Amino acid sequence: MSKVFDAKVLAVYMVAPNTYYMEFDAPDIARLAVPGQFVHVRCGETNDPLLRRPISIHMVSRPKGVLALLFRVVGKGTEILSQQKPGDRVNMMGPLGRGFTLPLPGSKVAVAAGGIGAAPLVFLVQELANIKCQVTVYLGARDKRSILCDGQFIQMEAEVVIATDDGSLGFKGTVPELMKRHMDWRKTAMTYVCGPGIMMKEISTMLAEADVPGEVSLEERMGCGVGACLSCAVKISHHGQISNKRACFEGPVFPSWQVVWE
């Protein structure tokens, strides 16, 4: 069950343009969290901004009780959060949402990340490494400076293949284009995806055509974070029936073949 905590900031620094890494002393969240879940963060001490911000869990250290977040500054709330200092306290709810489904130990899996979508996938690859999975990470961004988490994935002994839109690092093109050239669909037991909607839509179509199971982590605007306000509803198809599901409660992770992409 998720709870509300005042977590002490342990570290904060910029890792890429407008992108920040933060560590918190949050033993209860670190103990309970699974890959794909998020925390709902109160970014300041006043009511401006009023709403909390959902931020995916980047990594945890359960022995140390440390929670790590990786986020991009996109507005007032995340800008305020990025200005916190070690020793400050940040109010957060968590862990929230449905996380990723882990495959059988030793499985060959693919992980596709675009931009800040790499953030929740580090925790996932950490857990996949713990069960001896063979992991290939398809990592993309606009340019070399915007590539995130490649070093962390490599430290976890994942194979990392990079694509940049401008060709400044790795393959010139998109992550879906890279996967078409590189991926062995027949030997892939599971694929996990997080990134821009257009990327996730294209990869989901590819997975359906190859009959490969996959899960996507959706990044939706959220109000309450606990399923009450319905502001994060997404269309899901199940056995031919389309219904609205709450990204904060039934998600943010959904089977790739169930998402009705706009």
UniProtKB/Swiss-Prot annotation:
Q: Which GO terms describe its molecular function?
A: 2 iron, 2 sulfur cluster binding; electron transfer activity; flavin adenine dinucleotide binding; metal ion binding; oxidoreductase activity
Which family is this protein grouped under?
A: Belongs to the PyrK family.
Q: Coiled-coil segments, which residues?
A: none
Protein name (database record): Dihydroorotate dehydrogenase B (NAD(+)), electron transfer subunit
Q: Which PANTHER family match?
A: DIHYDROOROTATE DEHYDROGENASE B (NAD(+)), ELECTRON TRANSFER SUBUNIT, DIHYDROOROTATE DEHYDROGENASE B (NAD(+)), ELECTRON TRANSFER SUBUNIT-RELATED
- Which organism's genome codes for this protein? Desulforamulus reducens (strain ATCC BAA-1160 / DSM 100696 / MI-1) (Desulfotomaculum reducens)
- Which amino acids does the record list as binding FAD? R53, P54, I55, S56, L70, F71, R72, G77, T78
PROSITE patterns noted in UniProt: FAD_FR
Question: Which function does this protein serve?
Answer: Responsible for channeling the electrons from the oxidation of dihydroorotate from the FMN redox center in the PyrD type B subunit to the ultimate electron acceptor NAD(+).
Asked if the keyword Electron transport belongs to this entry, the reply reads: yes
Gene Ontology CC annotation, any one: cytoplasm
Q: Where in the cell is it found?
A: Cytoplasm
